[in-house]
């Protein structure tokens, strides 16, 4: 299970709130409507921050680095954060993320871990909004064994610290990951998994909303409840959870809603493997592993409908294309589904 870093937690000094206090920042909107183009907006923001820096505004240094980071200009962001790390804890946090993930520099997990420890161990009040996220990231390092010796026990301890008993202001990402952690470890602790997915879902986690649907569907950690399962899965699917979408495709097929299955499965199966998966992961904060699994499931069932002419005109050549895509995306899942097909259970 490949995890991702926790994004920089919001604090009262976001770029938008900061800029909103500076009326001159928005004058260009009234004077030059064509500047609504994104590139011009970024350029205007940079010019504004440059002027604030010239006037001695300390916060503007970090905001410039963060703007570089959000635009994907990682080398410039790294240089800016390195310059101000002694004066800005948010810069330290971002350096931890960048060194661990290799953004704008060669990955150095040990260095990334050290930066995160600085945040977690700091007694400075200005680090309070960063501590839960730093604990999540350190837990990730122990889970992956990067920069530290691998330890599921230490990962669990840090994630529990980050999750803070379901506090909505803590790390919702940690709450969701705990749900996955308890459902995947041996022996499984499904009641704990259900609890943490419930907490994370209540705090807005799309990943956990889909996971709850599956747990209700199969009666894992909770009594089986198909209505509750479909409610969770449909809401998660509408919000962009691709694994939930793939699970609904399977449900529609088994219930013989073939027309619905075909139209829904094609849309999911036709996602681009190279470009769409990273984009969906970024927008939804869902793990690529499960996005790929949802796509593979949709591709396989779409292929089956095409092969048999269920809800669509029979087309064996197109069916082969979708079967191949399912195998390419997730060979293990495709093999399991093919086995069910051979035994006439699909």
From Swiss-Prot:
Sel1-like repeats lie at residues 92-124, 132-167, 172-205, 206-241, 242-276, 296-331. The gene is Lrp2bp. It comes from Mus musculus (Mouse). May act as an adapter that regulates LRP2 function. InterPro entries: LRP2-binding, Sel1-like, TPR-like_helical_dom_sf, TPR_rpt. Pfam families: Sel1, TPR_8. TPR repeats lie at residues 58-91. The lineage of its organism: Eukaryota, Metazoa, Chordata, Craniata, Vertebrata. This is LRP2-binding protein. Keywords: Cytoplasm, Repeat, TPR repeat. GO terms for cellular component: cytoplasm. Its main location: cytoplasm. It is found in: Cytoplasm. It comes from the Eukaryota. Interacts with LRP2.
